[in-house]
């Protein structure tokens, strides 16, 4: 409870008037150094709000008298970095792709720069370790749809795959054999069993024998007579154990029925030539480059 102080010894400061179980609190003034510190912070805050950007407005904020901007600082740092690396980046652009590996300094720069570009733009689909995911190719192995040499990788990164924003994008389109009525369900089952056979999986031998003819008539034009695929049209090898969407019976049936149509952006619309070359060198050096 709060009561009016009634007792005060000579020389003692007054109390606050609060008494809790007989315990009272002196009403001592704050130390002078604390008050002056408080006043200084007020002056500093006023000065800061005048000199630096501080107060939000409807369409922006106050700029401050000295015009300081952390964004401008970052932009200056970026420009300074670009200027410092301008020579080697120009060298990277001017050097033949196949000759970059012969220059240790250039190769190291391209690999490091490419890793940064990859982490910023490519990991969303291909994964942070470049091992890919369902529908997104693994870049660590030597199974390439469009070619794994440095020039082929550069072309793929530059123009992309099946996009509508680059006339030179790599393009191929698998027919929807089931959805468009090109094959009936029995024929699809037969050709699926044949694909399982040539890929070394458990299969129905009788259905596979029928599927061989269907494969030759409908699939061999792209995947080859032996099913090993064709890089000219981005047709995958069906005889190995590497599958972009899955190699089990149900998934292969779905692929034959509805087809697949993966798309990759053309990075020449977003990255510089030096960046594209850097990431091509990086991907080529991951282990599966040819």
UniProtKB/Swiss-Prot annotation:
Sequence intervals crossing the membrane: 38-58
Domain spans labelled Cytochrome c: 109-199, 206-287
Claim: Electron transport is one of the keywords in the record: yes
Pathway noted in the entry: Energy metabolism; oxidative phosphorylation
Positions that bind heme c 1: 122, 125-126, 264
Ranges of the Cytoplasmic topological domain: 1-37
Subcellular location: Cell inner membrane
Residue numbers binding heme c 2: 174, 219, 222-223
Predominant cellular place of this UniProt entry's protein: membrane
Coiled-coil regions listed in the entry: none
Cofactor: heme c
Annotated GO MF terms: electron transfer activity; heme binding; iron ion binding; oxidoreductase activity
Cofactor, how bound (note): Binds 2 heme C groups per subunit.
Biological process (GO), any one: oxidative phosphorylation
SUPFAM superfamilies linked: Cytochrome c
Keyword Cell membrane (UniProt): yes
Region named Disordered: 1-22
Residue numbers on the Periplasmic membrane side: 59-290
Similarity field: Belongs to the CcoP / FixP family.
Oligomeric and partner information: Component of the cbb3-type cytochrome c oxidase at least composed of CcoN, CcoO, CcoQ and CcoP.
Function: C-type cytochrome. Part of the cbb3-type cytochrome c oxidase complex. CcoP subunit is required for transferring electrons from donor cytochrome c via its heme groups to CcoO subunit. From there, electrons are shuttled to the catalytic binuclear center of CcoN subunit where oxygen reduction takes place. The complex also functions as a proton pump.
Name of protein: Cbb3-type cytochrome c oxidase subunit CcoP
Organism, scientific name: Cereibacter sphaeroides (strain ATCC 17023 / DSM 158 / JCM 6121 / CCUG 31486 / LMG 2827 / NBRC 12203 / NCIMB 8253 / ATH 2.4.1.) (Rhodobacter sphaeroides)
């Amino acid at each position: 409870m709060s009561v009016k102080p009634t007792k005060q010894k000579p020389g003692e400061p007054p109390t606050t008037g609060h008494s809790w179980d007989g315990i009272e609190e002196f009403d001592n003034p704050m130390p002078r150094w604390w008050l002056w510190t408080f006043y200084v912070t007020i002056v500093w805050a006023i000065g800061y709000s005048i000199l630096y950007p501080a107060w939000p407005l409807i369409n922006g904020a106050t700029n401050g008298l000295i015009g300081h901007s952390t964004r401008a600082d970052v932009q200056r740092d970026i420009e300074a970095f670009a200027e410092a690396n301008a020579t080697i980046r120009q060298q990277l652009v001017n050097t033949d792709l196949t000759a970059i590996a012969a220059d240790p300094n250039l190769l190291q720069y391209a690999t490091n720069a490419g890793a940064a570009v990859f982490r910023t733009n490519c990991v969303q689909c291909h994964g942070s370790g470049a091992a890919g995911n369902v529908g997104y190719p693994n870049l660590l192995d030597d199974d390439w749809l469009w070619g794994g040499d440095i020039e082929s990788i550069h072309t793929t990164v530059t123009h992309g795959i099946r996009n509508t924003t680059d006339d030179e994008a790599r393009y191929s389109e698998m027919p929807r054999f089931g959805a468009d009525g090109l094959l009936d369900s029995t024929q699809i089952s037969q050709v699926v069993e044949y694909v399982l056979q040539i890929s070394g999986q458990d299969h129905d031998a009788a259905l596979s024998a029928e599927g061989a003819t269907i494969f030759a008539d409908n699939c061999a034009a792209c995947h080859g007579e032996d099913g090993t695929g064709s890089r000219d049209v981005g047709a995958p090898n069906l005889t190995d154990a590497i599958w972009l969407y899955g190699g089990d019976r149900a998934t292969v049936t779905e692929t034959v029925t509805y087809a697949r149509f993966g798309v990759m952006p053309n990075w020449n619309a977003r990255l510089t030539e030096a960046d594209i070359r850097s990431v091509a060198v990086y991907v080529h050096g991951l282990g599966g480059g040819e």
